[in-house]
Amino acid sequence: PDCEERELSRLNNFFCFPYLNKIDVLNTPSWVKNTVWYQIFPDRFCNGRPEISPEGVEPWGSAPTSFNFMGGDLWGVIDKLDYLEDLGINGIYFCPIFTSASNHKYDTIDHFSVDPHLGGNIAFHTLIEEAHKRGIKIMLDAVFNHLGADSPIWLDVVRNGANSHYADWFWIHKFPVYPDTPKSEWDFKNFNYETFGNVIEMPKLNTENEECREYLLSIVRYWTQNFDIDGWRLDVANEVDHHFWRDFRKVIKDIKPECYILGEIWHEGTPWLRGDQ
């Protein structure tokens, strides 16, 4: 017995704790820890150029609704950068700014253009330059789980059905994608494709499709390389496959190692926090 106890004592908890390899540990860029973020819903923040506001824009200060527009734009944000700096913030997280039909812009039409009613790519480029001069970081909201129903990619599927080049970019149960009934009768029980949150205007992307994946990754390359953004906030990240997020991280970190990646996870986040997503 004494000999057996001595042998056991030599183990010193061997195998009781896992060995953590550096590559498996999630590293948050050091600058993030000292960043005070300010979230901006662009349409509601400041109208810098009324001439680019959407048609039917509400008078500033009107009661907000789910669908109305107030006319806020990126020029307005530029006008208020000194004010934001005085508040003590040093990071701006923007709700989606890419071209779309809604005020919230989670229904993307074109991922490669800032919505013209927000000032387009020129306004965004100017904003980045002016923010960086003040030491303010910029994080964009990336919606890679779904597209908007007005996206040319989705409209091609609507028109051409199974013959569309993009038919496999979405999770479609059968064609045609829309039911043969008046639109007033459509609901999540009778349309023929997967969506985000049962919202018919947001068809869900199939990120297992190689072309679809590469399209989305090309968006990341474009904005990170050409506009030097500092972070990506990933909308409903838990609804996009892990393989895609691993590729996403590699693309981002190859371009800008200090770029911040933040995922929206509505439940236990551990599977996304292993250093590879």
State each model region's role:
Residues A237:
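Glycine- and other small-residue-rich loops at beta-strand/loop junctions that grip anionic moieties
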Residues P1-T35, G48-P59, P64, N68-F69:
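The feature marks proteins involved in alpha-glucan
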Residues V36-Y38, I92-F94, I138-L140, W232, ...:
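Hydrophobic faces of well-ordered beta-strands that scaffold small-molecule active sites
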Residues I252, Y260-I265:
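Aromatic- and carboxylate-enriched substrate-binding clefts and catalytic-loop regions
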